[in-house]
Curated annotation (Swiss-Prot):
Gene name of this polypeptide: NDK
Chief localization: cytoplasm
GO terms for biological process, alphabetical: CTP biosynthetic process; GTP biosynthetic process; UTP biosynthetic process
Species this chain originates from: Brugia malayi (Filarial nematode worm)
UniProt name for this protein: Nucleoside diphosphate kinase
Family of this protein: Belongs to the NDK family.
E.C. no: 2.7.4.6
Keywords (A to Z) from UniProt: ATP-binding, Cytoplasm, Kinase, Magnesium, Metal-binding, Nucleotide metabolism, Nucleotide-binding, Phosphoprotein, Transferase
Keyword Transmembrane appears in the UniProt entry: no
Catalytic reactions on record: a 2'-deoxyribonucleoside 5'-diphosphate + ATP = a 2'-deoxyribonucleoside 5'-triphosphate + ADP; a ribonucleoside 5'-diphosphate + ATP = a ribonucleoside 5'-triphosphate + ADP
C-alpha cells in the first residue's frame, strides 16, 4: 500500500492557463485532501520538454506536442498524499478527453487530446523522474498540513 508521502508531478498546460482554469484544476487536488509541496509558473523551453517527453520521441505528434507545450506558460506542481499518482490519473481522466467521464478534469474541461489541459505522472518512477526534472530539491517544501488529521486516520 502507498504511503501518505507519495508524490506526483502535475503540469497545467498552456491551453488551461489561457482559458483561466488554473484555480479549478488546483481546487480539485486541494478538495481531495492532497498537499501541495511545490509549484511554479514558467515557459518551458523546447529542450526541457524534449527531455520530459523523451519516451514519445519518434511518435508522429512529438514535435507538435513540444511546440504546443512551449507556446505559453505552464504551471508545474508536485502534490503529496496517499496513492496520489494513481488517484491523480483518475481525477484527470483519460488522455483523450472524449473518453473521460464527466466529473474528471479532462471530462469537464476539454474536448481534444491535443488540448487536454493537464499532464500527470503515469507511475511512481515517472513521477520521481519528472519531479527531479522540473524542480530542484530545495524547491520542494516540507511542511505539515493542519488538515492532515482530518484527511488521514
Amino acid at each position: 500500500m502507498s504511503n501518505t508521502k507519495e508524490r506526483t508531478f502535475i503540469c497545467i498546460k498552456p491551453d488551461a492557463v489561457q482559458r483561466g482554469l488554473i484555480g479549478k484544476i488546483f481546487e480539485r487536488f486541494e478538495q481531495r485532501g492532497y498537499k501541495l509541496v511545490a509549484m511554479k509558473m514558467l515557459k518551458a523551453t523546447k529542450s526541457h520538454l524534449e527531455i520530459h517527453y523523451q519516451e514519445l520521441q519518434g511518435k508522429p505528434f512529438f514535435n507538435d506536442l513540444v511546440g504546443y507545450m512551449s507556446s505559453g506558460p505552464v504551471i508545474a506542481m508536485v502534490w503529496e498524499g496517499l496513492d496520489v499518482v494513481k488517484q491523480a490519473r483518475q481525477m484527470l481522466g483519460a488522455t483523450n478527453p472524449l473518453n473521460s467521464m464527466p466529473g474528471t478534469i479532462r471530462g469537464d474541461f476539454s474536448i481534444q487530446t491535443g488540448r487536454n489541459i493537464v499532464h500527470g505522472s503515469d507511475s511512481l518512477p515517472s513521477a520521481e523522474r519528472e519531479i527531479t526534472h522540473w524542480f530542484k530539491p530545495e524547491e520542494l517544501c516540507e511542511w505539515s498540513s493542519a488538515t492532515a488529521t482530518w484527511v488521514y486516520e
